[in-house]
Amino acid sequence: MKLSRILGVVCLLFSSLCSRAATPPTVTIFVDATSAPRKIFHAKLKIPASAGDLTLYYPKWIPGEHAPDGPVVDLAGLKFSAGGKTLKWRRDLLDGFTIHVDVPAGENEVNAELDFLSPATFEGGFSAGSSATDKMAVISWNQVLLYPKGWKADDFTYVASLKLPANWKYGTPLPIASTSGESGETQITFKPASLTTLVDSPVITGEYLKVVKLADDPPTEMDIAADSAAALAAPPEVWDHYKNLVEQANKLFGAHHYRDYHFLLSLSDHVAHFGLEHHESDDSRVDERGLVDETARKAEASLLPHEYVHSWNGKYRRPADLATPDYQQPMQDDLLWVYEGLTNYLGTVLTARSGLLTFEQSRDDLAITAAMMDHIPGRTWRSLQDTADAAPQLYFAPQAWYSWRRGVDFYDEDTLNWLWVDVIIRQQSKGQKTIDDFCHLFHGPPSTGPILKTYTFDDVVNALNQIVPYDWRGFWTERLTNHGPGAPLGGIEGSGWKLVYDDNPSEMERGAAGNFHVVDGAYSIGLELREDGSITDTIEGMPAAVAGIGPGMKLIAVNGRQYSPEVLHDALKAGKDGNTPLELLVENTDYYKTYKLDYHGGERYPHLVRDESKPDLLTEIYKAK
């Protein structure tokens, strides 16, 4: 054989080996959720491998959670085998989400077994939170899988199957290949999907599960699991409002970027409460009576609109530094003022346009947001931009000292900022353009499946300038970096309204206090507390803080009488325009002390009132299209 021929054969063999080595693996995963009522999920995986060190990852940075909070602490029962023999493994000393497995020669597949321990009590946040009860569960695939090093999440193919408890139904956006089962137990085999799609497609399941069709083109539905059948019996107008939500959202954006969409809604007092976006679904969780109780329903009215908007803003359009290739590479949260802030604003708009809240309720809700942000003294040292930059820490910060530390204010403060943007667009264009035009340009046509298109700060500025030429870079730089004083109220004032305070709480204020079991003295004496008197925050510079009261203390008595919410309210009213100090007996780490507050302003609650000197743009913004 000639040398050239030999070299050619060698090159061909080398090329073939490299090609095989570079082929992304297909992983099979079986999840047994039949023990969900015990708060434990069992998983088995088959992972292609070769001799030597197999590096496996447990997902760390979960899209939408904006932090390295993958619930690795609840990964248990980890075992690996190949060829019928148990394999040794060790956790990486520099990264607890990385596992190294020693694969012997001659083996090309590793079997993995693991358990996920869902928190047994109401605790945790996002996919690390409580996710199962006796009657229902939510399976987030990132909880129950591993993936090998070396490829992007888009490159993997996962063939997944799931076994459910007897007589439990389910809902998911993940395409299904087949179902089977015996003795009431259901086993679902899903169509092969990329790891990206799998992690982005949770499953809701339960004994009491209701499916409500919202739209046909594309198919859109609510899959609602509850701890009781009674919790699913919402009045018919509720479903009408959610149908309106789908219609109004598609009008707002002018297109969609999903094949079908599933609102996955958990109704339980025993799972973690939050909303987490996915491209073709959302994982939202509220109180068991969150649909049937009118007060609870209003308190959480904007949750599903917010998560639905994320299908466009956050999933289809995403900051470039949040679009990482896998779940280990750190994400950068600096553009959360768009990802979450714009979403929050559009969510409030759609809440009003769909009828989930009336105009008056939406207006009162906006007043509460403005007042909250206007009582954040922490803005004097921490910019709005830093609340985004520090999001991985702030998401898990305690409630105590919130107003001085600041929290993830890019939600509420940017609701005000994006309202301001909407108002500027309307003013500069003499009513010819609105934020809807920006949404059409930035998030809109043509309709597609679940694809990703990234953006930068410059892209946002350029898109805004295409709608209305303006110093948008200067506007956002100022809004993100300034230190007050006070909240950005330009949007409210420019829309023809003013923030004022009086002694009558609005319907939304009363509802929030009752639903979340809090007493709000933030705008009077700067005191926030629970119904039992536990003080969650005091606002620096306001009477309670000036007197020496701080978070973690407990209010025992008011003006010599045992504390109750009503006693505090009555004392604030009685002290208005008087001369006698308000006396608060407070317990602090087993010690008692009476604090005297020189306050005589009565109760103060926020409202918006019309400024008749300006056009009423807010009513137009909230009007259904």
Language model: regions and residue ranges:
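Juxtacatalytic substrate-recognition/specificity segment
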Residues: 210-336, 342
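Sec/Tat signal peptide C-region and signal peptidase I cleavage site
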Residues: 17-21
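Non-catalytic architectural context of zinc metalloproteases
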Residues: 34, 46-48, 63, 68-77, ...
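Bacterial N-terminal signal peptides that target proteins for export
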Residues: 1-7
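Post-HExxH zinc-binding segment in Zn-dependent metallohydrolases
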Residues: 282-291, 316-317, 328-381, 585
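C-terminal recognition in membrane/secretory proteostasis and scaffolding
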Residues: 347, 357-625
